[in-house]
Regions:
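ATP-binding N-terminal substructure of ATP-dependent carboxylate-amine bond-forming enzymes
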Residues: 1-94
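Short beta-strand-to-turn element immediately C-terminal to the catalytic PLP-Schiff-base lysine
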Residues: 7, 123, 155-159
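Acidic/polar helix N-cap motif
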Residues: 47-50, 102, 125-126, 159
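Residue-level detector of structured alpha->beta connecting loops
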Residues: 62, 86, 114, 137-138
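Conserved ATP-binding module of the ATP-grasp superfamily
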Residues: 65, 116-119, 138-142, 158-173
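Short, glycine-/small-residue-rich phosphate/pyrophosphate-handling segment
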Residues: 101-132
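ATP-grasp fold ATP-binding core
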Residues: 110, 134-157, 173
Length: 173
């Protein structure tokens, strides 16, 4: 079996190590990969968000299974595109990946269905977030960015000044 892993971080390296142990796997590809993954797989310089190129590469190499490890291509719908092209893929489709891709969506869903979760608030305005921190927040704050990315943007801020600076920076982009 030929396997393509999409991503180039530690998660994808761990996936490549596990896949390499299978006697059923003859060849591993990775896009874009990294130096560590290159010891286990043939890496191709295709970005994780270049869906058309990933689909074409998978077809060209006659890949049997694509494993999508990174959040951004999952949230963007790569699994949907692969399946549309008749390529087997492991990972959630776009409509399910939003659970990982949007902390606000996930928290709102948990609240709606009474699923236990830590207290939270969602803000789209930095001034409203800062006002909440100054008047309502009673404990140290864990602030999560609204963006997915190659690394999780989450900060445990012990004092309001740091929380306010982080909010302003995140909203400024």
């Amino acid at each position: 079996m030929k396997v393509l892993i999409v991503g180039g971080g530690g998660r994808e390296h761990a996936i490549a190590q596990s896949v390499a142990k299978s006697e059923k796997v003859d060849k591993i590809y990775c896009t874009p990969g990294n130096a560590g993954i290159a010891a286990l797989a043939e890496c191709a310089p295709i970005g994780a968000m270049e869906f058309d190129k990933i689909v074409a590469f998978a077809k060209e190499k006659e890949v049997d299974l694509v494993i999508v490890g990174m959040d951004d291509p999952l949230v963007g719908g790569l699994v949907d595109e692969l399946e549309k092209a008749g390529i087997r893929a492991f990972g959630p489709k776009k409509n399910a990946a939003i659970l990982e891709g949007s902390k606000a969506f996930s928290k709102d869903l948990m609240k709606k269905y009474n699923i236990p979760t830590a207290a939270y608030e969602n803000f789209t305005d930095p001034d409203a977030a800062i006002k909440y921190l100054e008047t309502e927040a009673k404990f140290s704050n864990c602030i999560k960015s609204r963006w997915t990315g190659s690394w999780e943007r989450s900060f445990d801020l012990q004092y309001t000044g740091g929380s306010k600076r982080w909010c302003q920076r995140d909203y400024d982009g």
